[in-house]
């Protein structure tokens, strides 16, 4: 079983010069405003670290968290950073994904060699939105051989059973599902442990 032994806030950055040194592998969490990034991060890490903005789309800083993961079964202990990006696409503050990510954020994603995994959160109730398609295309266009992209569907518990089943069968792979705090709705949907195992596997495939 994987346990998060430590998780704490490092810094908020609005410029590359403000970012912490690239000393360990990192995963980036990205998604539209109100997709549930803060809830996902807090559940994943077992600690209330990520804060939701009172005004969706207002935050423009990247938040860095240091985390230590332990897999006792495999005698493994590893430290990774989690980078929480500002939510994109809120209609009142942005006209396009390109504008959202120009400058600092795009430069951060393009040049930071320590980033090994992009986790794109998608609202399960609103699939195939143009802004999510654009986000996926932009991330995949800059992926290096030592990086991976993974979709994770939030708000899964808001779907009825037929909708859940269709999503599970038809969603493009690879993907994970974040149901209500990762409580398994049935044996075929992932628990928090499965999510952690999957992310750890990606992060360890190409360590820094």
UniProtKB/Swiss-Prot annotation:
- Record keywords: Cell cycle, Cell division, GTP-binding, Magnesium, Metal-binding, Nucleotide-binding, Septation
- Gene Ontology CC terms, in alphabetical order: cytosol
Give the protein's cofactors.
Mg(2+)
The protein's matches in Pfam families, at most eight in alphabetical order, are given as: MMR_HSR1
Cite the EngB-type G domain residue spans from the record: 23-205
The keyword Cell cycle appears for this protein: yes
Provide the binding site for GTP: 31-38, 57-61, 84-87, 154-157, 182-184
Q: Which GO terms describe its biological process?
A: division septum assembly
Give GO MF terms, alphabetically: GTP binding; metal ion binding
Give me the residues that bind Mg(2+), please.
38, 59
**Signal peptide interval:** none
Report the sequence similarity comment from the record.
Answer: Belongs to the TRAFAC class TrmE-Era-EngA-EngB-Septin-like GTPase superfamily. EngB GTPase family.
What role is this protein assigned? Necessary for normal cell division and for the maintenance of normal septation.
The UniProt entry, under HAMAP family, shows:
GTPase_EngB
What's the protein here called?
Probable GTP-binding protein EngB
Gene name of this polypeptide: engB
């Amino acid at each position: 079983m994987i346990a998060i032994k430590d998780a704490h806030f490092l810094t908020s950055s609005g410029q590359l010069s403000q970012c912490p040194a690239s000393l360990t592998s990192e995963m980036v969490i990205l998604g539209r405003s109100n997709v549930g990034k803060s809830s996902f991060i807090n559940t994943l890490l077992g600690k209330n670290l990520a804060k939701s903005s009172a005004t969706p789309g207002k935050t423009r800083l990247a938040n860095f968290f240091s985390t230590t993961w332990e897999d006792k079964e495999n005698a493994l202990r590893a430290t990774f950073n989690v980078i929480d990006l500002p939510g994109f696409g809120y209609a009142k503050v942005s006209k396009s994904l390109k504008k959202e990510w120009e400058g600092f954020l795009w430069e951060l994603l393009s040049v930071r060699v320590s980033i090994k995994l992009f986790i794109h959160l998608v609202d399960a109730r609103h699939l195939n939105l143009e802004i999510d398609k654009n986000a996926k295309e932009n991330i995949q266009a800059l992926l290096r051989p030592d990086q991976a992209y993974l979709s994770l569907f939030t708000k899964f518990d808001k779907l009825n059973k037929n909708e859940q089943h269709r999503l599970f069968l038809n969603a493009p792979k690879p993907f994970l599902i974040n149901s209500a705090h990762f409580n398994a709705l049935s044996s075929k949907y992932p628990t928090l442990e499965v999510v952690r195992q999957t992310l750890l596997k990606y992060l360890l495939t190409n360590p820094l």
